Protein backbone atom coordinates (compact mmCIF):
# COMPACT_ATOMS: atom_id res chain seq x y z
CA UNK A 1 0.00 0.00 0.00
CA UNK A 2 2.84 2.31 0.89
CA UNK A 3 4.41 1.54 -2.51
CA UNK A 4 1.13 2.40 -4.28
CA UNK A 5 0.95 5.79 -2.57
CA UNK A 6 4.54 6.53 -3.56
CA UNK A 7 3.88 5.50 -7.16
CA UNK A 8 0.70 7.61 -7.22
CA UNK A 9 2.55 10.62 -5.82
CA UNK A 10 5.37 10.20 -8.38
CA UNK A 11 2.90 9.96 -11.24
CA UNK A 12 1.13 13.13 -10.11
CA UNK A 13 4.42 15.04 -9.77
CA UNK A 14 5.73 13.94 -13.17
CA UNK A 15 2.36 14.57 -14.83
CA UNK A 16 2.07 18.07 -13.41
CA UNK A 17 5.70 18.76 -14.33
CA UNK A 18 5.03 17.64 -17.92
CA UNK A 19 2.02 19.95 -18.19
CA UNK A 20 4.05 22.85 -16.81
CA UNK A 21 6.90 22.14 -19.23
CA UNK A 22 4.49 21.93 -22.18
CA UNK A 23 2.96 25.29 -21.23
CA UNK A 24 6.41 26.95 -21.15
CA UNK A 25 7.63 25.59 -24.54
CA UNK A 26 7.56 27.97 -27.50
CA UNK A 27 5.78 26.50 -30.49
CA UNK A 28 7.96 25.34 -33.39
CA UNK A 29 8.03 27.83 -36.26
CA UNK A 30 5.71 26.97 -39.12
CA UNK A 31 7.59 25.36 -42.02
CA UNK A 32 6.83 27.23 -45.21
CA UNK A 33 5.72 25.55 -48.42
CA UNK A 34 7.71 25.26 -51.61
CA UNK A 35 5.76 26.29 -54.66
CA UNK A 36 6.46 25.66 -58.31
CA UNK A 37 4.87 25.21 -61.66
CA UNK A 38 4.65 22.47 -64.25
CA UNK A 39 4.42 23.71 -67.81
CA UNK A 40 3.11 21.22 -70.30
CA UNK A 41 3.24 21.58 -74.03
CA UNK A 42 3.25 19.43 -77.11
CA UNK A 43 1.42 18.76 -80.30
CA UNK A 44 -0.84 15.91 -81.35
CA UNK A 45 0.05 14.86 -84.89
CA UNK A 46 -1.52 12.52 -87.40
CA UNK A 47 1.61 10.59 -88.42
CA UNK A 48 3.32 7.25 -87.90
CA UNK A 49 5.63 8.64 -85.17
CA UNK A 50 6.12 11.66 -82.98
CA UNK A 51 9.35 13.62 -82.68
CA UNK A 52 11.07 13.07 -79.32
CA UNK A 53 11.82 16.22 -77.32
CA UNK A 54 15.54 15.36 -77.47
CA UNK A 55 15.39 15.80 -81.25
CA UNK A 56 14.00 19.30 -81.41
CA UNK A 57 16.55 20.69 -81.70
CA UNK A 58 19.33 18.16 -82.24
CA UNK A 59 22.51 19.81 -80.94
CA UNK A 60 25.81 19.05 -82.71
CA UNK A 61 28.88 20.49 -80.97
CA UNK A 62 32.05 20.21 -83.03
CA UNK A 63 34.08 21.86 -80.25
CA UNK A 64 37.41 22.83 -81.87
CA UNK A 65 38.53 21.75 -85.35
CA UNK A 66 42.05 22.68 -86.48
CA UNK A 67 42.26 24.34 -89.90
CA UNK A 68 44.76 21.63 -90.90
CA UNK A 69 41.98 19.03 -90.53
CA UNK A 70 40.17 20.76 -93.42
CA UNK A 71 43.04 20.54 -95.93
CA UNK A 72 42.39 18.76 -99.24
CA UNK A 73 38.59 18.87 -98.73
CA UNK A 74 38.78 16.50 -95.76
CA UNK A 75 35.59 16.07 -93.73
CA UNK A 76 36.37 16.94 -90.11
CA UNK A 77 34.35 16.45 -86.95
CA UNK A 78 32.18 13.60 -88.24
CA UNK A 79 29.71 13.74 -85.35
CA UNK A 80 27.13 10.93 -85.38
CA UNK A 81 23.68 11.92 -84.11
CA UNK A 82 20.13 10.57 -84.31
CA UNK A 83 16.74 12.04 -85.00
CA UNK A 84 14.68 10.15 -82.43
CA UNK A 85 11.07 9.29 -83.17
CA UNK A 86 8.74 8.05 -80.45
CA UNK A 87 5.53 6.05 -80.27
CA UNK A 88 6.02 4.74 -83.81
CA UNK A 89 3.26 2.56 -85.23
CA UNK A 90 4.42 0.36 -88.13
CA UNK A 91 0.82 -0.35 -89.12
CA UNK A 92 0.68 3.31 -90.25
CA UNK A 93 4.08 3.39 -92.04
CA UNK A 94 7.03 1.03 -92.44
CA UNK A 95 9.85 3.45 -93.38
CA UNK A 96 10.84 7.08 -93.02
CA UNK A 97 12.94 9.46 -95.08
CA UNK A 98 14.34 12.83 -94.07
CA UNK A 99 14.72 16.00 -96.12
CA UNK A 100 17.27 18.49 -94.79
CA UNK A 101 17.16 22.20 -95.60
CA UNK A 102 19.89 24.57 -94.42
CA UNK A 103 18.80 28.07 -93.45
CA UNK A 104 21.52 29.30 -95.85
CA UNK A 105 23.25 27.21 -98.53
CA UNK A 106 26.99 27.87 -98.89
CA UNK A 107 27.57 30.21 -101.86
CA UNK A 108 30.76 28.45 -103.03
CA UNK A 109 29.86 24.80 -102.39
CA UNK A 110 26.13 24.10 -102.70
CA UNK A 111 26.58 20.75 -100.91
CA UNK A 112 27.38 22.59 -97.66
CA UNK A 113 25.30 24.64 -95.27
CA UNK A 114 26.70 28.10 -94.71
CA UNK A 115 27.76 29.46 -91.34
CA UNK A 116 25.06 31.92 -90.27
CA UNK A 117 26.99 33.54 -87.42
CA UNK A 118 30.46 33.64 -85.95
CA UNK A 119 33.70 34.82 -87.54
CA UNK A 120 34.94 31.55 -89.12
CA UNK A 121 34.81 31.43 -92.91
CA UNK A 122 35.92 29.38 -95.90
CA UNK A 123 34.13 26.23 -94.74
CA UNK A 124 30.63 24.89 -94.21
CA UNK A 125 28.61 22.03 -92.77
CA UNK A 126 27.69 18.83 -94.61
CA UNK A 127 25.61 15.81 -93.65
CA UNK A 128 25.64 12.11 -94.49
CA UNK A 129 22.47 10.05 -94.13
CA UNK A 130 21.89 6.64 -92.52
CA UNK A 131 23.27 4.97 -95.66
CA UNK A 132 26.51 7.03 -95.43
CA UNK A 133 25.51 8.96 -98.55
CA UNK A 134 26.07 12.70 -98.83
CA UNK A 135 22.81 14.52 -98.18
CA UNK A 136 21.40 16.55 -101.06
CA UNK A 137 19.48 19.50 -99.63
CA UNK A 138 15.69 19.35 -99.98
CA UNK A 139 15.87 15.74 -101.21
CA UNK A 140 14.63 12.65 -99.37
CA UNK A 141 17.35 10.47 -97.88
CA UNK A 142 17.70 6.70 -98.03
CA UNK A 143 14.62 5.17 -96.31
CA UNK A 144 15.09 3.95 -92.74
CA UNK A 145 13.08 1.01 -91.41
CA UNK A 146 10.74 2.00 -88.57
CA UNK A 147 10.15 -0.18 -85.53
CA UNK A 148 7.23 -0.02 -83.13
CA UNK A 149 8.00 2.30 -80.24
CA UNK A 150 11.25 4.27 -80.60
CA UNK A 151 12.94 4.57 -84.00
CA UNK A 152 16.17 6.43 -84.64
CA UNK A 153 17.30 7.99 -87.90
CA UNK A 154 21.08 8.42 -87.77
CA UNK A 155 23.08 11.06 -89.58
CA UNK A 156 26.66 12.32 -89.53
CA UNK A 157 27.51 16.03 -89.50
CA UNK A 158 30.90 17.26 -90.66
CA UNK A 159 32.82 20.46 -91.38
CA UNK A 160 34.50 20.82 -94.77
CA UNK A 161 36.37 23.56 -96.63
CA UNK A 162 34.31 25.22 -99.36
CA UNK A 163 36.87 24.27 -102.00
CA UNK A 164 40.34 22.74 -102.31
CA UNK A 165 41.93 26.19 -102.47
CA UNK A 166 39.66 27.91 -99.90
CA UNK A 167 41.31 30.05 -97.26
CA UNK A 168 39.76 28.79 -94.05
CA UNK A 169 39.63 31.54 -91.43
CA UNK A 170 39.61 30.32 -87.80
CA UNK A 171 36.81 31.43 -85.50
CA UNK A 172 33.51 30.40 -84.01
CA UNK A 173 30.61 29.37 -86.22
CA UNK A 174 26.96 28.40 -86.06
CA UNK A 175 24.72 26.91 -88.71
CA UNK A 176 21.08 25.85 -88.81
CA UNK A 177 19.72 22.92 -90.81
CA UNK A 178 16.00 22.16 -90.64
CA UNK A 179 14.61 18.70 -91.30
CA UNK A 180 11.33 17.08 -92.24
CA UNK A 181 10.54 13.40 -91.69
CA UNK A 182 8.21 11.77 -94.24
CA UNK A 183 6.68 8.34 -93.77
CA UNK A 184 6.09 5.60 -96.34
Curated annotation (Swiss-Prot):
Subcellular location field: Fimbrium
GO terms under biological process: cell adhesion involved in single-species biofilm formation
Entry keywords, A to Z: Disulfide bond, Fimbrium, Signal
Gene3D superfamilies: Fimbrial-type adhesion domain (2.60.40.1090)
One GO location term (cellular component): pilus
Endpoints of the signal sequence: 1-22
Disulfide bonds: 49-88
Function recorded in the entry: Major structural component of PMF fimbriae.
Similarity section: Belongs to the fimbrial protein family.
Record protein name field: Major fimbrial subunit
Species of origin: Proteus mirabilis (strain HI4320)
Gene that encodes the chain: pmfA
Amino acid sequence: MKLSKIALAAALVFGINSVATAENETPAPKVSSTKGEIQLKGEIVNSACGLAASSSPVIVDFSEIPTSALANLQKAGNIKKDIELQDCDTTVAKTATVSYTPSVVNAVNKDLASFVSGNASGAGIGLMDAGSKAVKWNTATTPVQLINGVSKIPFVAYVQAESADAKVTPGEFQAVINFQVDYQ
